[in-house]
Amino acid sequence: MKDSFLFTSESVTEGHPDKMADQISDAVLDYIIERDQKAKVACETLVSNGFCMITGELKTSVYAPMQEIAREVVKKIGYTDALYGFDYRSAAVLNGVGEQSPDINQGVDREDGEIGAGDQGLMFGYACKETETLMPLPIHLAHQLTFALAQKRKDNTLPFLRPDGKSQVSVRYENNKPVSIDTIVISTQHSPEVSQKHLKEAVIEEIVYKILPKEYLHDNIKFFVNPTGKFVIGGPQGDAGLTGRKIIVDTYGGSCPHGGGAFSGKDPSKVDRSAAYAARYVAKNLVASGVCDKATVQLAYAIGVIEPVSIYVNTHNTSKYSSTELEKCVKSVFKLTPKGIIESLDLLRPIYSLTSAYGHFGRELEEFTWEKTNKAEEIKAFFKR
């Protein structure tokens, strides 16, 4: 008997208010880390109707021109006219950034050269064989749709689109394998002149059908494009945006647990970010090595402590090896101290703006070192001993 179910994931465009906040926070981080690799950065951003507030804590000798950084991000996204709900030229930018607490810093920067974890917490990584990038199919497709919304807007293929938007993809699984697409939801901000009929037809023809893999298509897919009938007011005019509110969009679309820590605006001494990247690196290499078809990896840390307090591997009954054996392999092959993660993944670089929209995982860019499968052979060798 077939075990059949639907699973759904969503994505948002770079013009979504929460993603605007993430991108501003990461742009601040990139500006600082490019000039001061020892900097400690925890940058939070709020965008709302006509203004942006940047806050958080820093430990750096670098002066960051917050107004210029924020305005450039908003301009690049495409909020270049007040009619879109936000304008990079006229929006107020408030700077409320303070200094990092010395109580925290004393546990992170150590005299022996090691780095203690910047906070306690648990982080998850995940990989599976549903796509070439070893990501779950629903979130993979959802990101492709939102990215295409932005590209078709920017290249004027669909000039009536505006920056804010979302996608949602429901996939049918049988015996834990994706077999078809059931439902596509796309909500996109648009100019007031375009008819909903034209918008729906254009989005489906120019974006959806050009993105979706043919093997998952059929005649009964349900399409909902702007199901409320109108989406003119968008961006920060429609909803306030905050850094760190799209943590499921940023990761695996709900396919695995989440430890709760957001990524954007945090330098790699914060294990919320760096250890989540490391957990993806571990999970992806386990699957790429062939020791399992699916892997969920949990790492946990204590503030100021060098080694992880726990490592857990769940292969969802797709491996002949036990969790105990896999944990030993992970400890042997990967460096999972904060310093080990930072060095092995080369994280002290201004790469974070690239991560802040369309997912931190499953995008095989040169800068995304945690997406490499260069540990797969070491994993194979470990189990041949």
Swiss-Prot record:
Residues 100-110 are annotated as: Flexible loop. Its EC number is 2.5.1.6. The keyword Transport does not apply. It catalyses: L-methionine + ATP + H2O = S-adenosyl-L-methionine + phosphate + diphosphate. One of its GO terms (molecular function) is methionine adenosyltransferase activity. It is found in: Cytoplasm. One of its GO terms (cellular component) is cytoplasm. Keywords: ATP-binding, Cytoplasm, Magnesium, Metal-binding, Nucleotide-binding, One-carbon metabolism, Potassium, Transferase. Its cofactor is Mg(2+); K(+). Pathway: Amino-acid biosynthesis; S-adenosyl-L-methionine biosynthesis; S-adenosyl-L-methionine from L-methionine: step 1/1. ATP binds at H16, D164, G165, K166, K230, F231, D239, R245, K246, A262, K266. Binds 2 divalent ions per subunit. Binds 1 potassium ion per subunit. K(+) binds at E44. GO terms for biological process: one-carbon metabolic process; S-adenosylmethionine biosynthetic process. Catalyzes the formation of S-adenosylmethionine (AdoMet) from methionine and ATP. The overall synthetic reaction is composed of two sequential steps, AdoMet formation and the subsequent tripolyphosphate hydrolysis which occurs prior to release of AdoMet from the enzyme. Homotetramer; dimer of dimers. This is S-adenosylmethionine synthase.
